[in-house]
Amino acid sequence: MAGLPDRDKLIRNFSRCLNWEEKYLYIIELGGQLAPLTEQQRHPENLISGCQSQVWIAMTLSAEGHVIFAGDSDAAIVKGLVAVVFILYHDLTPQQIISLDVRPFFADLALSQHLTPSRSQGLEAMIRAIRTKVANLSAH
């Protein structure tokens, strides 16, 4: 997660944005900080269904049992939302990710009411897919 802020800094930075245009630009900037995916990570099994844009999310377990994320999207704002999700789940174990309800966090940022319905549905699809995949990660 090199380059991405931690959860508290994300909230601080987001609150400093004066309007939604600045917040969107900040989200896009976060997406630009994601490391590029390898061709292997762009495998169809990492493609998230339910998103209007193409979204890939790859996950592995660290030696300490924390989930390591890699992701990308063909849409700049969605790539930024991927980065926001990764910030929320950073340094967590599969069980912690499954237990964590991120919806209140999105409500605090007022993301839900400022995203189009299709983007909100895509965000929900991303969260569901991550929870399903981490459950499979911890089972292996």
Curated annotation (Swiss-Prot):
Cellular localization per UniProt: Cytoplasm
Active site: C51
Biological pathway: Cofactor biosynthesis; iron-sulfur cluster biosynthesis
Domain of life: Bacteria
Record flagged with keyword Cytoplasm: yes
GO cellular component: cytoplasm
Gene3D superfamilies linked to this entry: 3.90.1010.10
SUPFAM superfamilies: SufE/NifU
Alphabetized InterPro entries for the sequence: Cysteine_desulfuration_SufE, Fe-S_metab-assoc_dom
Disulfide bonds: none
Pfam families hit by this protein: SufE
GO biological process, one term: iron-sulfur cluster assembly
Keywords of the record: Cytoplasm
Subunit description: Homodimer. Interacts with SufS.
Similarity annotation: Belongs to the SufE family.
Function, as annotated: Participates in cysteine desulfuration mediated by SufS. Cysteine desulfuration mobilizes sulfur from L-cysteine to yield L-alanine and constitutes an essential step in sulfur metabolism for biosynthesis of a variety of sulfur-containing biomolecules. Functions as a sulfur acceptor for SufS, by mediating the direct transfer of the sulfur atom from the S-sulfanylcysteine of SufS, an intermediate product of cysteine desulfuration process.
NCBIfam families reported in the protein's UniProt record: PRK09296.1
Protein's name in the database: Cysteine desulfuration protein SufE
Species of origin: Yersinia pestis
Gene field: sufE
